[in-house]
Amino acid sequence: PDRPPTRRPPQEGESEALPKDKEYISVKADYKVSLVKISDIVYLESEGEYVRMHLADGTTITTLFRLKNMETALPSESFMRVHRSYIVNLRTIKAYVKGRIFLNDTEYVPIGENYKEAFQGYIDKNFRNL
């Protein structure tokens, strides 16, 4: 008999709902699963085995994820890893000054040496007319 292919269950640090074409991501935090709108994520910050999601409304969600898993799960046209500890939503960048990406007037993330070339390529490609 034909049966649908079985999916392996998600491993620790993975999420069940991370297809790149989705609008929301499911996140386990504080003993519950929450749906977070992907466009509301300003940046992600690695804290050891945890990832802190900084959201547009100023709140944060800390979840047991690896930043590497989030990097592959989020849409690459909207998110870029810019440091070993940070992934930013490219649509939320307000300024780029001396190796720092400003997300608002006071909050910024550093750009790691290994990520500068790729980020500069993104800037050159998308903002060359400025």
Predicted segments, located by residue:
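Short, charged, intrinsically disordered terminal tails
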Residues: 122-130
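Conserved binding/recognition cores within well-folded domains
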Residues: 1-104, 108-110
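Basic, Lys/Arg-enriched C-terminal extension of HTH/homeodomain DNA-binding domains
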Residues: 119
